[in-house]
Amino acid sequence: MARIAGINIPDQKHTVIALTAIYGIGKTRAKAICAVTGIAEDVKIRELSEEQIEKLREEVGKFTVEGDLRREVTLSIKRLLDLGCYRGLRHRRSLPVRGQRTKTNARTRKGPRKPIKK
């Protein structure tokens, strides 16, 4: 198994799909990384040479991924909470942040229904 950005990349998958195992790299960014490094998208990870894997490591290292990205997201949400702005209040109350309706729907964000006690 190849190890990129502290993550074991699955050997049996194509390069583009395998790169998406890294938090912060989706299909579009994975395709861009393959294009820059000159590695074909349909080649499986186990078929890559050590130099090609090293190229992938260098290219992925240019982006904020994994723990750093998770920390960045957490800190930005914490900053909103500390500011006390509208978005921060929505995060604090576990409600949708981006203006979705809450009279109906929003069950994922609000959690299971709480019965009314009589």
Curated annotation (Swiss-Prot):
Keyword Nucleus: no
Recorded superkingdom: Bacteria
Cysteine disulfide partners in this protein: none
Role this protein plays: Located at the top of the head of the 30S subunit, it contacts several helices of the 16S rRNA. In the 70S ribosome it contacts the 23S rRNA (bridge B1a) and protein L5 of the 50S subunit (bridge B1b), connecting the 2 subunits; these bridges are implicated in subunit movement. Contacts the tRNAs in the A and P-sites.
Family listed: Belongs to the universal ribosomal protein uS13 family.
HAMAP family noted in UniProt: Ribosomal_uS13
Assembly with partners or alone: Part of the 30S ribosomal subunit. Forms a loose heterodimer with protein S19. Forms two bridges to the 50S subunit in the 70S ribosome.
Protein name: Small ribosomal subunit protein uS13
Annotated source species: Actinobacillus pleuropneumoniae serotype 5b (strain L20)
